[in-house]
């Protein structure tokens, strides 16, 4: 089960375990970015909001983990994403208790997303994309794609083509934002009345 791209020392994190203490005092935003390329799409989120929130980053590859730790150090908490199995996901969520979850690009974990919906945890799909090849596969399972994506409070596509493909598979409203590696239009701000109500705002 442990692949070469994974960390053989920290592999227990893939089963929901952690050796860390949960930081106190600030609410936690969980950003999932599977690879280095996807992680770079979350750069501006980390740089703009680490002062006001605890930022938990999950990745699935050691290369992405090394990039996150090297470039951001104490600004973030890094963990490997748990495998998409209910028991391990619940263990992870019970410990970290995120107020907002941000999924970057295309690495959607169906079981995890359903667990977030059950817990009423706000989830956003940013820099969303779906390749023509994946789109052709999902067309045969569009009802399941609708079931997964109805969890998302908002979906922002990285291109007009991605927007059209995703719109045809989901009942959600999909907005075009552009590639987050090239833009910083998106702002995430706490509601003025309560820090637990997080608004998504487009500049």
How would you describe each model-predicted region?
Residues 192:
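Acidic/histidine-rich catalytic neighborhood
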């Amino acid at each position: 089960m442990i692949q070469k791209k994974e960390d053989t020392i920290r592999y227990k994190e893939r089963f929901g375990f952690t050796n860390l203490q949960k930081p106190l005092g600030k609410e936690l935003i969980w950003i999932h970015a599977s690879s280095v390329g996807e992680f770079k799409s979350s750069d501006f989120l980390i740089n703009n909001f680490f002062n006001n929130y605890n930022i938990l980053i999950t990745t699935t590859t050691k290369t992405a983990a090394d990039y996150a730790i090297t470039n951001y150090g104490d600004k973030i908490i890094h963990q490997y994403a748990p495998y998409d199995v209910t028991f391990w996901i619940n263990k992870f969520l019970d410990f970290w208790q995120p107020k907002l979850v941000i999924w970057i690009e295309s690495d959607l974990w169906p079981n995890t997303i359903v667990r977030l919906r059950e817990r009423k945890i706000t989830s956003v799909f940013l820099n969303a994309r779906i390749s023509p090849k994946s789109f052709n596969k999902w067309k045969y399972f569009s009802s399941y794609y609708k079931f997964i994506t109805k969890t998302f409070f908002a979906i922002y596509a990285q291109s007009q083509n991605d927007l059209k493909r995703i719109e045809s598979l989901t009942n959600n409203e999909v907005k075009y934002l552009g590639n987050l590696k090239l833009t910083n239009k998106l702002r995430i701000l706490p509601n003025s009345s309560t820090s637990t109500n997080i608004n998504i705002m487009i500049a």
